[in-house]
Regions:
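CBM-like, beta-strand-rich accessory domains located in the C-terminal region of large
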Residues: 223, 382-383, 389-394, 405, ...
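Carbohydrate-active enzyme catalytic cores, enriched for enzymes
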Residues: 321-499, 504, 553-557
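Extended, charge-enriched "interface" segments that sit outside catalytic cores
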Residues: 31-160, 167-171
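Beta-strand-rich N-terminal accessory domains
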Residues: 20, 28, 40, 56, ...
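Boundary detector for helix-to-coil junctions that initiate low-complexity/charged tails
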Residues: 1-29
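Aromatic-lined, polymer-binding surfaces characteristic
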Residues: 146-150, 155-159, 165-363, 375, ...
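C-terminal substrate/ligand-recognition segments
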Residues: 175, 493, 595
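Residues that flank catalytic or metal-binding motifs in active/ligand-binding sites
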Residues: 173, 280, 362, 453-455, ...
Length: 701
């Protein structure tokens, strides 16, 4: 019997020591003990800092006197419009460009703005839902659950389960729709968009006093809200709807946001910082640079600039991949850094050359992993997270990361990124780009590329794309958003997805579904003895025990034949250890993509092992069985799946795979049915399995 040992306390401590070191491990233990003691004080409501900023507090925050308050606010109003990277002087040219050359974008923007005016939102896969009037900011529209708005933020649990998704009210309260309304008002002159924007901000402030309710429970969302409020406010600041009285209320709320963030930075007990902490930093950077009249702004700005540089070094690997093992979070973090870099440049705040160098590499990574159809693979967790949505609100696929190139084009003068950005290149207009000065677009490179530090290996040529995932548990071994997807394959042929990563459906609202989607068995890889590549930690969602290491043994790219060989040792912890090696062979002349797996025992005992292969196909694929394989039928082509052929001890068999109905999550909160092929083998190792996909298939039989 093969035994997968349980995770003991010693295992956890050793993993922490390897991932973050002795100091951080001791720190984590002390902080957890302190939190248990401190929780008694919270339960007795003895510790309740107030973050409300009323009239006298706003006067003090601005370092002025009551009789001078309006003068200070008027000066801030005048200056705020020039404190974002957006150049108001270019507005006539931008408006003309949208009306004459980006008519589809303008139409989609106004259509989405109309939906918001009617309080219709699509929140994390809910589909268009009317939230009524007034909007209930404390309700999860998908489950109907409502959080008590009088509960202090620190007392709100984050994981109710039973279908209750705390991320839904958080997403709504991030305020992405406010920037949309302000843009629509700016480009169309529509008064109702400006009125709706100010009305929604007023309604939110009245329903969400600082520090109370679900929408203050996560500092990351507080920070993102601050950024979006500043964008909306700066774009509308010259309009009559922005009265001095209303403006003062918003500034008071933003001061509360800044103070809240400084006191509630999201640092893990082990000292590890990730995308949440970075979002906190970016929120403080925006507040510090755009609200310079606030007395604490200098402190916020100085802290944020230091932390921004430090987090680039901590979170972004040498080849440009973000360290949390998720493509979706790579996009979010890249957006945070790009937006911050543009803001710093606008305010003449110098950032180190190494910061810019690594940020440019983040964009190169996104260009590398983007498929020919403009969409990114769904590797690791994904919650549709964005810092701000300046193009494509409500109508662009959340897997489209090309807006990064629109901003990257402005920062790094990479001419080829205009073509890579597709319609999202106009993101750059909101960061200072001039439409008339844009050169003729050039084709983006389409060659194979490897990102060894992050573990993405991509074999691509024209309209064909294959990605082998070799990224280990990230976040310094914590694996916050990592899935058990080692050596899994994404395959895209002639404009269509064939093999796909199933993505991520839900987080805390359905822990069982979350674990299913991140399991080894959900991905196009091999499961040995029903074990996970990295063990799931009972009771903990956003982490994996770091059991696996990956080694790439061969990488040959660029010719008519390309080869990639890699292996992982995640199954060597088993009582009878096993190593999995996978070879990818691409023959471009014969248009064939072949996968060969070898599983070998790491000891001399002749013991039987249970091995299972999983291949999740894209939803548009249909599979039809044939004598020695399967036909893969899509709306635009027919491919041939040859095999599988399983060889062990001089004997080769052609096991009959079982066709299952699986699920693919194209975005958080939404699934599609998709075919899954599975086959199993049981016996004494070593065993080798080979299968291939080709355009040149057998005739129908």
């Amino acid at each position: 019997m093969i035994i997968d040992p349980p995770i003991g306390t010693g295992d956890r401590i050793r993993a922490k020591l390897q991932g973050v070191g002795l100091y951080a491990t001791v720190r984590m233990g002390l902080l957890k003990g302190f939190r248990l003691l401190r929780s008694r004080w919270h339960r007795n409501q003895l510790v309740r800092p107030s973050y409300r900023v009323d009239g006298p507090a706003l006067v003090a925050a601005l370092g002025t006197t009551p009789d001078q308050l309006n003068r200070v606010l008027e000066r801030l109003k005048v200056d705020l419009g020039n404190r974002l990277p957006f150049d108001p002087a270019k507005l006539p040219a931008i408006r003309a460009y949208y009306r004459e050359q980006a008519t589809d974008e303008l139409a989609a923007m106004t259509e989405s703005a109309e939906q918001v005016c009617h309080h219709v939102f699509d929140l994390l896969g809910s589909g268009p839902v009317s939230l009524g009037d007034p909007i209930d900011w404390h309700r999860d529209v998908k489950s109907g659950y409502r959080w008590d708005p009088t509960v202090y933020f620190a007392d709100i649990p984050h994981g109710q389960g039973n279908g209750v998704d705390i991320k839904v009210p958080w997403e709504l309260s991030r305020g992405h729709h406010l920037v949309l309304l302000s843009q629509a008002a700016l480009l169309t002159g529509g008064e109702k968009y400006a009125r709706e924007c100010t009305a929604l901000m007023t309604a939110w402030m009245e329903a969400n006093p600082p520090g109370y309710g679900v929408n203050w429970a996560c500092p990351m969302d507080v920070a993102i809200r601050a950024v979006n409020w500043i964008w909306a406010l700066a774009l509308l600041v010259d309009r009559p709807e922005v009265t001095t009285r209303w403006f003062s209320e918003v500034i008071a709320s933003l001061v509360a946001h800044g103070r809240f963030l400084m006191e509630n930075l999201e640092v893990r007990d082990d000292g590890v910082t990730a995308n949440h902490y970075l979002s906190n930093v970016v929120g403080l950077l925006y507040l510090g640079l755009c609200l310079k009249e606030v007395c604490e702004a200098g402190q916020w700005r100085a802290f944020a600039v230091r932390a921004l540089v430090r987090e680039m070094e901590r979170q972004v690997l040498a080849d440009g991949l973000h360290f949390e093992s998720s493509v979706s979070y790579h996009r979010l973090v890249a957006e945070c850094f790009l937006s911050s870099a543009a803001l710093c440049r606008h305010h003449a705040v110098d950032l180190p050359s190494e910061f810019h160098h690594r940020l440019e590499k983040m964009c190169e990574v996104a260009a590398g992993y983007t498929k020919p159809n403009g969409l990114a693979p769904q590797i690791g967790d994904g919650d549709n997270g964005r810092l701000h949505i300046l193009t494509g609100y409500g109508h662009r696929d959340v897997r489209d990361h090309r807006h990064l190139f629109g901003l990257g084009r402005v920062l790094f003068d990479r001419v080829e990124w205009r073509a890579a950005a597709g319609p999202s290149w106009i993101e750059g207009l909101w960061f200072g780009a001039t439409p008339e000065s844009e050169p003729t677009a050039t084709a983006a490179p389409t060659g194979s590329i490897a990102f060894p530090a992050g573990g993405f290996y991509i074999l691509r040529h024209e309209q064909d794309y294959l990605l082998l995932n070799c990224n280990p548990p990230g976040t310094n071994g914590v694996g916050t958003h990592k899935h058990n997807d080692l050596l899994s394959v994404e395959l895209y042929i002639d404009g269509e997805d064939i093999l796909v990563d199933p993505g991520c459906f839900l987080y805390t609202s359905d822990p069982q579904a979350y674990n299913r989607f991140r399991s080894t068995r959900a991905h196009s890889t091999v499961t040995v003895d029903q074990a996970e590549q990295n063990r799931l930690i009972p009771g903990k969602l956003f982490c994996l025990h770091p059991d696996s290491r990956v080694q790439v043994l061969q990488w040959e790219s660029g010719g008519p034949v390309e080869r990639l060989v890699a292996e992982h040792d995640g199954y060597e912890r088993l009582s009878h250890p096993v190593r999995h090696r996978r070879e990818i062979f691409v023959d471009r002349l014969n248009e064939t993509w072949q996968v060969t797996d070898r599983l070998t025992a790491r000891d001399d005992r002749s013991l039987s092992h249970h091995v299972e292969w999983t291949l999740p196909f894209a939803p548009q694929c249909s599979l039809l069985p044939a004598r020695t394989g399967w036909y893969i039928v899509t709306p635009f082509q027919r491919l041939w799946f040859e095999g599988p052929w399983v060889s062990s001890r001089d004997k080769t068999i052609n096991p009959l795979p079982h066709l299952d109905e699986g699920l693919v999550a194209p975005q958080y909160g939404r699934t599609q049915r998709a075919p899954v092929l599975r086959w199993r083998w049981e016996g004494v190792l070593p065993v080798e399995c080979r299968f291939s996909v080709s355009r040149a298939g057998n005739e129908w039989s």
